[in-house]
Amino acid sequence: MNGLIKHTAIALAIIIPLAAFSAYAAPMSAPSTTTSNVTTDKTTTATLAIKPSSIIHKSASKPTTVDSVDLEQYAGTWYEIGRLPMYFQRKCASDVTATYTGKTDGSGITVINKCSGENGTAITAEGLAKPADNTGSKLKVSFLPSWIRWLPVGRADYWVLARDSDYKTALVGTPDKKYLWLLARSPNITQQTYAKYREIAQQQGYDLKEFKLTAQSNQTVNLVP
């Protein structure tokens, strides 16, 4: 028994820090539909589903989420347009995506994160997301091994701060304001959409000095940071 306890303790010491990688997750499609590489983004200020209270003073302790997220519409593959630096993404040089698929047994949402390293090496991580409440706008995500996910640790908060009405673009961040991702169904969005989401992030209190755009193989639009 002592040997088992010691083994488990060592495993936890190694594995639990990996839970921070869950912030690298991106939002569940009716499994994903085919996305075009052509820029078809028509997001405007009016189509962004933003709660009025989300426009808060940046000194507020926590950001505000959208009122609701339909997880079936939210499912599928998302391209990372840009992000704040994150340790567990330090080896991702380009082509960052996240695919969400609802589990048939209703136990949660499978999250598959992928990216390409500096030398073109494929990097993949699999995790499990669960809604934190009935709005769907807050997810608890874990990348711990399945045999240890029952522990009440290693789950990162993943909040949808803004999205458009068609679930084509979304802004996701952590409540401590350390991490932030701009996501889209296509690797291309307009400069107008990019600027609007940056504005929302700043109004929510996120520091964007280190925000970086993500290179995608099929990008045809060069955004101005």
Annotate each language-model stretch with its function:
Residues 2-10, 17-225:
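A beta-rich soluble binding module of mature secreted/lumenal proteins
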